[in-house]
Amino acid sequence: RLQAECGFDLSALYVHHSLQAEADDWLVFCESYCASLNVPFRFEYVQVARSGKGLEAAARQARYQAYERSGAEVIALAHHQNDQSETFMLAALRGGGLRALAAMPQWRTFGENQQIWRPLLTVSRDELQRYADEQGLSYIEDPSNADNSLLRNWLRNEALPLWRDRVPQLDQQLSAGIQLLQQQLAVLDEVAEADAAWLEEAGYFDCGRWRTLSPAKQKQQLYHLARRKHLGVPSAVSVADFQRVLQHISPGTQAEWQLPAGKIYAYQNRLFALREDWLADCFWLNPQKMTGEDACLKETVATGSIKLCWHKLGLREDVLEQKPVIRAVTTDDIIELTAGHKKVRKLLQECKIPPFARPHWPVIVDVNNRCIAVANIWVSPSHACLGGWLPVFEQFNLFILEPK
């Protein structure tokens, strides 16, 4: 009914975690129920990789990755007021900060262009139960909710009922407090955004400017950067450790901050935030992704992520028709300069490319394994012409701090 009234397409996604024997039955139930409502339905199996996380956190991560892959503009979730109370209490028991204590917002940006919507946060579980019973709706009880060895379940089944006996309006009071926290958090986020815009005014995270901030704002900006770049939530200890490193690091030294979903590197007074999959498009690092041996450079580039860009001194057309190889630089690679030759690793160092990026830098070598071009930077004069073509991997441009 709402689809016709509001003009949107509704579909349902069941995420199968393969954690419970009943999961297949739940899939059948959801599929049948959606069919009765003429709502398109699909399901997705996910692997729950704990990798240091608790079971609940690992399952949540796998589930949200499935939501992101769905391509839906808005993902509607059924968290209710009691869930909100549990989330707040969990955050408090785990020593969470303001963002954790602010629990679940009704709306939040998710992924690149998606929104998470929780329309039932002001509705209690009892109200939902009464509605389902009155309307004769079928529903499923998850048996794992009875497992009080999980902290959330213990709160739900043991602790919070006692609090509700003492404070009958507990959930409403917590909800009101959470809304105030969310308002205060929104103001802090506005301040953080303004500071971030100033720090990155030159197009990169300026550590020199960052050092002029108060210690509290310095930490806030590190949290903010990790969140903006979708690198996961760092612990307070790791933020404090990296803050100390940045206070004293020399420009030519590289520092690394390991995060749940990637890394942040410091080099030459800049920060570089990288997801775990930042090398995914570097086809030259994976021989299986390379074009066949008979392909010329033009064909290899056409099927990969490297582009040919016009350059004042670039590769000649006849070189593009040959069959050179694109691969990662090695310690033995040497490139011809206008006068003499130079080790490619030295050239990368002179361009102030961060050490973490240098081993992955693409070079083009001829059939004799001689380097004829360094992507984004230089072309051997004996293979070049005025107004030729420079192989460019655009993702790596941000690493060239001192262009040739």
Predicted regions and their residues:
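Core alpha/beta nucleotide-donor-binding catalytic domains of modification enzymes
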Residues: 1-161, 190
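AMP-forming adenylation/ATP pyrophosphatase catalytic core
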Residues: 3, 15, 46-48, 62, ...
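Short coil/loop linkers at secondary-structure junctions
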Residues: 9, 40, 138, 169, ...
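Conserved anion/nucleotide-ligand pocket segment
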Residues: 156-174
